[in-house]
Amino acid sequence: MDITQKNKRDGTEVTERIITETVTTRLTSLPPKGGTSNGYAKTGSLGGGSRLEKQSLTHGSSGYINSSGSLRGNASTSSYRRAHSPASTLPNSPGSTFERKTHVTRHGTYEGSSSGNSSPEYPRKEFASSSTRGRSQTRESEIRVRLQSASPSTRWTELDDVKRLLKGSRSASVSPTRNSSNTLPIPKKGTVETKVVTASSQSVSGTYDTTILDANLPSHVWSSTLPAGSSMGTYHNNITTQSSSLLNTNAYSAGSVFGVPNNMASCSATLQPGISTSSSVFGMQNNLAPSSSTLSHGMAATSTAYGVKKNMPQSPTAVSTGVSTSAASTTNVQNDDLLHKDCKFLILEKDNTPAKKEMELLIMTKDSGKVFTASPASVAATSFSEDTLKKEKQAAYTDTYLVSEANGDVKTVTAKGNGASADIHGYDHRRGGGGGGGSGGALGSGAAGGGGKGSWGAAPTWCPCGSWCSWWKWLLGLLLTWLLLLGLLFGLIALAEEVRKLKARVEELEKMRGRLSYNEKMERSSQDSVQGVAPRLGEGLGKSELDDYNLEDVWQFMKVRLMTEQENGNLRGSPGPKGDMGVQGPKGDRGFPGTPGIPGPLGHQGPEGPKGQKGNVGEPGMEGPMGQRGREGPMGPRGEPGPPGFGEKGDRGDAGKPGIPGPPGVPGSVGPKGSIGPQGLRGEVGLPGIKGDKGPMGPPGPKGDQGEKGPRGLTGEPGLKGLPGAVGEPGAKGAMGPAGPDGHQGPRGEQGLPGMPGTRGLPGPSGDPGKPGLTGPQGPQGIPGTPGRPGVKGEPGAPGKIMTSEGSSTITVPGPPGPPGAMGPPGPPGAPGPVGPAGLPGQQGPRGEPGLAGESFMGSSSSFSEVLSTQGIDLRGPPGPPGPPGPPGEGLPGPPGPPGSLLTSSETFFSGPPGPPGPPGPKGDQGPPGPRGHQGERGFPGLSGSGSSSLGLNLQGPPGPPGPQGPKGDKGDPGVPGAPGIPGGPSRGGSSSSTTFMQGPPGPPGPPGPPGSLSSSGLEIQQYISDYMQSDSIRPYLSGVQGPPGPPGPPGPVTTITGETFNYSELASLVVSYLQTSGYNIGTSSTSISSEDILAALRRDDVRQYLQQYLMPQGAGGDWFLQSLDYAELSNRILSYMSSTGVSIGLPGPPGPPGLPGTSYEELLSLLQGSEFRGIVGPPGPPGPPGLPGSSWSSISTEDLSSYLQTAGLSSIPGPPGPPGPPGPRGPPGISGALATYAAENSDSFRSELISYLTSPDVRSFIVGPPGPPGPQGPPGDTRLVSTDSSYSRSGSSSSFSRDTSYSSSMGIGGASGGSLGEAGAFGMDMGRGYGAAAESGMYGGNGRFGTSFAGGLDYNELAVRVSESLQRQGLLQGMAYTVQGPPGRPGPQGPPGISKIFSAYSNVTEDLMDFFRTYGAIPGPPGQKGEMGIPGPKGERGPAGPPGPRGHKGEKGDKGDQFYIGRRRRSIAVKP
C-alpha cells in the first residue's frame, strides 16, 4: 500500500513531466518497504521534501518532476524515476530490496529497511531515525543483517562499515545533514522518506541481491558508496563488476540493502566518473556520480542534484541507452549497473529516459517480493528530458536534492526536507555505487548516478565532458564572460557619458550663439525704434496739423517737449536687453580694517547650577617624609673568641728571577795579523760577445746592379736613377728607342686607335643594339670560333683547375691565358688592329730583350716609364716593352679577351683591353719578335717568375693593355721577359708558352713588384700601388692604355641555350691558358695560328674536359654545355684572344705593339719613378709578378705573388705598368725589403702620390675605367666576368689571379671605372682577391668559375657596350682601346719588373721617379680634382668702429594705449543699447 501510495504521490508530485507510471514504480517498492518511511518521508517530502522534489523537478528528470509533485513520494520516486521511469518504481524496488532480507532476492532483502532509505548507505540508524516509516530501528538491523549476509564483499559484513557507509552516503546525500560524513544521520523525518526513495531508487534497497553484489562487485562498492566522495568511487568499481550482473538480475536487492553500496557496486566502471562527480554532492549524489563514465554524460548532471538531477545529465545517454544495455555506455552502464544492483537504480537510469524496460527491471518486488515493473519507463524517458531541461534550475537545490536523487529515499528526503535528504544520501551512495545511485533510489541510481555529478560542479547535461566537467570550470567561464560583458558595459557607459557631455557642450554653445544673435537683433531694433520715433512723429504732425505752422516752430516745440519729457523720465524706453557681462574689474584695494565694535553689555549672572555629585574617594596621599633616625642601640656584649685557625704549610716559593747580567767585559787585545793567503785563480776568459746581427743589406746594392743597367738605360735620366740604369739594359730597348718613334707612331697609333675607336664605336653601337652585336664582332673571328669549341672544353675549367694547381706551383700563367680567353670577345675590338702599328714597336720588342737582360729594373723601369707615359700619352708607348709579346701579336685577335684575362690578374680592366690588341694581331707578324721575347730570357728569371708565372701572368693580364705597346714591346720583349719573367718563362717553356709570356712584357707593370713586396710587406705595397693606381695623377697613364682593352671584352659573352650568357672571350682565354699550361702547341708556328688549329685544339679531350669543368659550375651538365658551345665561335675567340693577349700560343707578340703607343717605357718609368709614383710602376707590377718570379721572384712564391697581387688590387693598373714589368724580375728581390722599406718610409707620400695620380680623371678612367675595358669581356656579363675571373683564379693561381683581377676590376662596376675599383677591392687585383674571398660574386671561392658568372647571366655584350661607352665618354678608347686590349695583356708580366725594380731597389725606383718628376715635373695627369675647401682662416681682428650712421628718421607717433581706448569704446557701446 505504501508503495502504491507512494507511487501515487510520486505520480502526483512527479507527474511533472514524467509519466505517472514512473512515479508508481519508483516509489512503490520503497513505500511498501518502508510504508512508514514512505508515508513519513513522502509526506515529509511534501513538506520538507517539497523543496527536494522541486529540486528534483529542477533537475529535469521526469521522475524527479514527479517527485516534485508529491514531495516525499516524489522525491524518492523522482530519484528513481529520474534514473528511469521505473525509477519511481525503484523506490519501491529498494523498498522491496530492503524488505528482502535475503540479498539473493533483490526485492525483499533490502526492501523494508533499504527501500525507505536511499540504500544501504543510510545507516540503519539513519534509516530508522530518518524514516518515518518506523523503519529506523528495524531498518538498521535489517541493513546490518543484509550487509553481513548479502554483501558479497566482505566490506559490507562489518556493521560499522555499513553504518559508516550509510552515514557517509547519507551525508553525501542532499539532505542538509552531514554531507558525506559517516555519522550523518539524515533527519529521521526526512530520512524515512528518503529511505523509501532510496530503496526504490536503488535496487540497492530493493535489489540488494547478495548474489548480485557478490557476483558483480562485492559490497566493497558500497563501502565506497557510503562515503559520499569515496564511496562513489567504490560504487563505481562495484558497479562495474556488477553492471552486467545487476542488469541481468533485476533485483539489485542486495544492493538495496545497502542501497547505496549495492548501487555503487552495480555502478559500472564507467559510472565511476559520474559517481565521483555526484559523490561530491552527497552520498546520494555519489550514487548518481557512480553512473558509469558513459553515464556520466547523462548521469553526471543528475548526480549533481539528486537521482533526478542525475537523470538529467543522464538523459543524453543514460536515459536512452543507459539502462537496459549500456553497461559500457555511460548512461547505460550505469543503468545496467543500477538495475542489477538495484532495480531502483536501473529505474533511475531508465527514468532518465530511455529504458523503460530497465526501469521495469529496476523496479523490484518489495521485501514482500513484489517486483515493481518499470511501468514508468516512459516516465523515465520523459523525466530524463525534463531533468535535462530542469537540471540547471535545480542546481540551487542540488545539495538537498542530491540526496534524494541519489536514492529513492532521497525523494523521501525531499518530502522530509533535510532529514529526507540525509536518508537519500545513504541511498545515493549505494545507488551511485550500484550505478543506479542517482539521486533517488526510485529515480534509478544509474540515471541519478550519471547526473549526480551534475549537482554542484557537475557539467550540464549537454556537456560532453559529463562528469569530468568541474563546476569551477563552468564558473570560471561564466565569470570571465561576465567580466567581459561588464567591461563592455562600462566602456559603453563611459562612451555614453562622453557623448552626453559633448552634446551638452554643443547645446551650450548653440544657446550662447543664439543669445548673442538675439542681443544683436534687439540692439538693432531698439536703435531703429529710437531713431524712428521722432521722424515718424514729425511726419505725421507735419501732414495733419502743422502744415500751416512753421516747421521750425514745430521742431522747437518738439525739442522743448522732448527735453521736458526726458527730464521727467518719461522718454525712457523699455529696458534694453541685458548687456554682456563686463570684463571683471580689477580687484579693489583691501579695505581699511573697521573700527572695533563697542563692547557689549555685561551679561546677567546665570542661575546657580545644580549641586554636583559626590566626588569619588580621593587618591591616597603621597608617602609622608621619612621619620627621624632612631637612636643607636646599646653595644652588644663582646663575642666569645673563635676557635684557633688551622692550615697546612704552604708550598715552597718559586725560585727568584735571575739577576741582571753584569756589565760587559773589557775587550780582548788585538790578535796577531794573519798570514797572506794564496793567490787566487785567474778568472776564466769571458764568453765571446754575441755576434752582431748582420746589418741590413743596403738597398743600394741592388741599385748598383741596376746601375749597370743604368748604362743601358741610355735613357739619361733613368740612368741617373740606378733604375734607369736598369733601363739601360732596356738600352737594348733603347734600340727599341727607335721603336720609341714607333711609339710615336703609337700615338699615331692612338690616333689610329681613335680610328679604332671609331671602329670600336661601331662595335659599341653593336653592343648597344644587342649584346650580340658585340658578339657579332667576334663572329668575324668566327674562324677562331672553331677553336673556340675546343676552348669550351678547356673552359670546363680544367684549365682553371690546372691554373689553380699550377697557380701555386708554377705556370699558373697559363691559367691567366684562360681568362684572356674571355678576352676573346675583345676580338671585335679587332678594330684595335690599327694598333697594329704599335706592332712595329713590337719589333722593338727585341730591344725588350735587353730589357730581360735588364733584369735590372732599370731596363724595365724605362720601359715602364714608357708604358706609363704611353698610358698618359699613348698607352701603347709603354706597352712597347710588352711588345715582345708582340710576336704573339698575331694573337692580336686575342686582344679581345685573353689580354683581359691577363689583365684580370693584375687589373681586371685589362682583360677587356686585350680585345683591342686584336688589331695588333697583325703585329703578330712581329710575333717573331716574340721569340726575342725569349731574349727576354731575362724574363727567364721571370721564369722563376714563371713559377709564380701564374701570378705574373695573371698580373700581366692587367698589363694587358700595355700589351698594345707590345709592339714596342718587341724591344720591351726582352724587357718583358726580364720582368715578367713570365714571358721569359713562357719562352723557356716553349715558343708558345714563351710567347704567352712574351705578352708577359706587359707584365712589367710593376705589379709583380708588389708581390715582391709581398714577402716583406705585400699589403703595404698593395695598398700603395692600389692607391697609387687609383690616384688621378697616374690614372691617366694607366687609363690610357688600359681603357682601350676594355672594348674587346664585350664580344666575349654569348647566350647559351639555357639563356645564360656565355662569355666566349672568357672561355677562349681559359682555353688558351689551359693549352699553354698543358704545353699544347696550337698551330705549327707560333706566329700564325688559324682558327682551325684552335678548333682542333679545342676538340682535344683534355681541353673539352677542362671546358666542361670550367662550365660545370653553371649547373648545366658540362657535356651539354660543351655541346651547346659554338666551337667555331670559341676558336675565333681564342684566336682573337691569343692574338690580343699575345698569349696565343706564341702569338702574344702582337699585343706588344700596342704597347708602343704612348710614352716610351723608359719615359713612363722615369716619370713614375721621378714622381714618387714608383707605386705606379709597381701597380703594373701585378702583371709583373709573374715575371718577377723568374729572377727575383725566386724568393717569392707564386702564391705569395698572386695573393699579393690580388690583395694589391693592382690588376687594373697592370696594363700601363706592364712595360715596367721587365725590370720587375730583378725587382722582386728588392721588393721584399726595399719596397717594404720604401712603403714604410714614404707610405704617406707614396700613397698620396699614387692616389693622386691614379685618381686623376685620366688615370682613373684608365685604371678604373680602361681596365674596365678589359672587363669588357666581363662586360658581357659583369657577373660573369667576375665569375670568370674567379674561375681563373681557381684554376690557376696565376692565371686565375690575372683573370680575376682583370675581369673583376673591369667588371666590378661594369664600367671602365667600375672595373678598376671593382666592387670588392680597390683594384682588379684587389678584386681578384675579393673573388677568392667571395668579394666578387664569390666566384673564386664559390667555385663560381664560369658557372657563377654564368649564373649571373651577365650580358657580356651589354657590359661591353656599357664599358665601351664609358671609355668613349672618357676618351679612353680613342687611341688606346685597341692598343691596350690584346697585347698589353701579355706585357703585363713585364709589369713585375717595374715592381721588381721597386722591390729590388725601392730606393732606386723612388729616386728614379723622383728624378723623373723633378725633371719633367709630375706626370702631367689630368688637372687635379678641385681641392677641398680650405680650412677657414682665423677670424680677423675686429675692425675699427665705423663712422656713425646717419640719423634715422623720426619715428611715427606711437598709438595711444589701447586699454583706455578700448575701455572708452566699450562704455560707449554699452550706452548705445
From Swiss-Prot:
Q: Where is this region: Triple-helical region?
A: 573-1459
Cite the record's Pro residues compositional bias ranges. 814-835, 878-899, 913-922, 1001-1011, 1179-1188, 1214-1228, 1266-1275
Localization per Swiss-Prot or TrEMBL: Cell junction, Hemidesmosome; Membrane
- Glycosylated position list: 1404
Which Pfam families does the UniProt record give? Collagen (PF01391)
- Positions with biased composition (Polar residues): 57-96, 111-120, 170-184, 1198-1210
Q: Where is this region: Necessary for interaction with DST and for the recruitment of DST to hemidesmosome?
A: 146-231
Q: What residue intervals traverse the membrane?
A: 475-495
Q: Where is the composition biased (Basic residues)?
A: 1463-1473
Ranges for the region named Nonhelical region (NC1) are: 1460-1473
Q: Where is this region: Nonhelical region (NC16)?
A: 1-572
- What spans does the record annotate as topological domain Extracellular, numbered to this chain? 496-1473
Q: Which InterPro entries does this one have?
A: Collagen (IPR008160), Collagen_superfamily (IPR050149)
What does the PTM comment state?
Answer: The intracellular/endo domain is disulfide-linked. Prolines at the third position of the tripeptide repeating unit (G-X-Y) are hydroxylated in some or all of the chains.
Reading the lineage from the top rank, the first entry is Eukaryota
Q: Which GO terms describe its biological process?
A: hemidesmosome assembly
Which keywords fit this entry according to its UniProt record? Basement membrane, Cell junction, Collagen, Disulfide bond, Extracellular matrix, Glycoprotein, Hydroxylation, Membrane, Repeat, Secreted, Signal-anchor, Transmembrane, Transmembrane helix
Name the major location: other
What are this entry's molecular-function GO terms?
Answer: extracellular matrix structural constituent conferring tensile strength
Give the start-end ranges of region Disordered: 1-155, 168-188, 567-1017, 1173-1234, 1261-1308, 1417-1473
Q: How does it assemble?
A: Homotrimers of alpha 1(XVII)chains. Interacts (via cytoplasmic region) with ITGB4 (via cytoplasmic region). Interacts (via cytoplasmic region) with DST (via N-terminus). Interacts (via N-terminus) with PLEC. Interacts (via cytoplasmic region) with DSP.
Q: What is this protein called?
A: Collagen alpha-1(XVII) chain
Question: Organism, per UniProt?
Answer: Bos taurus
